[in-house]
């Protein structure tokens, strides 16, 4: 008994772990897989409680019906669907005319909402599966960049050094082994010429596209599920009805009062009854679907703009170079080569994520550390670009700088100690 309880709690904890926010994404991604998914799942639980715990349908039956017959009528009408006829219209005599007016979606509302919540989470699961295939651990990099211990300057400097080394090793791994690891690019379609350094960034843009496609599919499913194909903009039409003063009696989208036909055998004879029923659950369902339609409209617009932003930021070489130059705060003819040959799109993507989560200061420090690695590997003097003077001027005054000049000089990550003289070896360029 105790073992089964532990197993159940383990599976529950594993399921809830998927609802935890990740660090290797942005706010728009969390709008999809965390906030929207959780909200739709709550709606599914709410409607389920109303249907299976409360009384979703109440029928007006003849006076001679007993309580058991009334319960049978309500259960039958709930399972076999009801149909809606405007009060000013006559009830059709033909049974097939009545069947064409049946409303059969309200029983499936909780299941449809649960599937919708799952669909909002699928792109995030695909991102988790594909983002770790390149050796560039974006989640680990952002966790280190965002840790609270970085408020200590010593810890921050050590963290920046670790981040720069990890990013450099991962980018070098991509340059050296990317051509031999072509199978990891099949799922994300990232064969962008000879630049295998665009794997993570291309997968991320692909996930953004999945989010946008999911919102569009949700619109199509909403109209198909509610059988409102003649109104492509379902929520807009319902709101238009409400603005004109047309309530549910006229529109028929979520009718509260419906009709139900059923037959009863009495002494070998079949008696047909037509009763009038109240679908209380439709009042709740109407509000949920109108809210979802409006929310999907806003979410689709936000996702489209966000996708356009990331496409420009990662696909445009000019945008990538401007981003790197802004955080280096310098002008150099080597920035283009540093961005396109050393960092490449994946490195710029990581720096943009660091700037978004840990702030521009941390991003500038990491960019500068990578710049120093690039200069050393290129065989250029490390201090010929005056990196330290432009950065220190933002956080310390001239008096502090003069006072520090009078103190014994300490090593820092800006000025690495010079190694003892060694024979000059040929320098191998990994990014040319």
Specify the residue positions occupied by each region the protein language model found.
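Membrane-embedded alpha-helical segments and the immediately adjacent membrane-proximal loops
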Residues: 1-400, 405-408, 414-431
């Amino acid at each position: 008994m105790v073992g089964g309880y532990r197993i159940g709690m383990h599976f529950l904890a594993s399921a809830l772990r998927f609802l935890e926010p990740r660090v290797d994404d942005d706010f728009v991604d969390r709008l999809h897989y965390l906030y929207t998914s959780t909200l739709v799942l709550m709606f599914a639980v709410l409607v389920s409680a109303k249907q299976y715990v409360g009384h979703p349908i109440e029928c007006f039956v003849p006076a001679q019906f007993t309580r058991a017959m009334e319960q049978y009528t309500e259960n039958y009408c709930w399972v076999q669907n009801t149909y809606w006829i405007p009060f000013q219209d006559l009830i059709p005599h033909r049974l097939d005319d009545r069947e064409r007016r049946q409303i059969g979606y309200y029983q499936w509302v909780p299941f449809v909402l649960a599937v919708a919540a799952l669909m909002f989470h699928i792109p995030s699961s695909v991102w988790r599966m594909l983002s770790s295939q390149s050796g560039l651990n974006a989640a680990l990099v952002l966790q280190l960049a965002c840790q609270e211990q970085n408020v200590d300057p010593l810890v921050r400097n050590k963290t920046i050094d670790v981040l720069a080394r990890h990013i450099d090793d991962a980018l070098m791994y991509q340059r050296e082994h990317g051509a031999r690891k072509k199978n990891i690019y099949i799922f994300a379609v990232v064969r962008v010429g000879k630049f295998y350094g665009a794997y993570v960034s291309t997968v991320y843009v692909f996930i953004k596209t999945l989010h946008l496609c999911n919102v569009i599919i949700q619109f199509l499913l909403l109209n198909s599920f509610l059988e409102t194909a003649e109104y492509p903009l379902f929520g807009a039409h319902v709101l238009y009805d409400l603005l004109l003063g047309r309530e549910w009696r006229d529109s028929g989208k979520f009718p509260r009062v419906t009709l139900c036909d059923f037959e009863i055998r009495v002494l070998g004879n079949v008696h047909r009854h037509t009763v009038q029923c109240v679908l209380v659950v439709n009042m709740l369902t109407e509000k949920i679907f109108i809210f979802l339609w409006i929310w999907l409209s806003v979410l689709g617009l936000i996702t489209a703009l966000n996708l356009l932003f990331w496409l420009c930021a990662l696909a445009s070489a000019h945008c990538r170079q401007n981003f790197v130059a802004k955080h280096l705060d310098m002008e150099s003819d080597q920035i283009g080569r540093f961005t396109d040959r050393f960092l490449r799109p994946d490195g710029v993507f990581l720096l943009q994520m660091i700037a978004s989560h840990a702030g521009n200061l941390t991003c500038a420090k990491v960019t500068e550390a990578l710049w120093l690695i690039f200069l050393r590997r290129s065989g250029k003097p490390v201090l010929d670009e005056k990196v330290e003077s432009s950065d220190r001027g933002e956080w310390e005054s001239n008096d502090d700088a003069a006072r520090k000049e009078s103190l014994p000089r300490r090593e820092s990550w800006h000025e690495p100690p010079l190694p003892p003289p060694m024979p000059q070896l040929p320098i191998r360029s990994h990014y040319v």
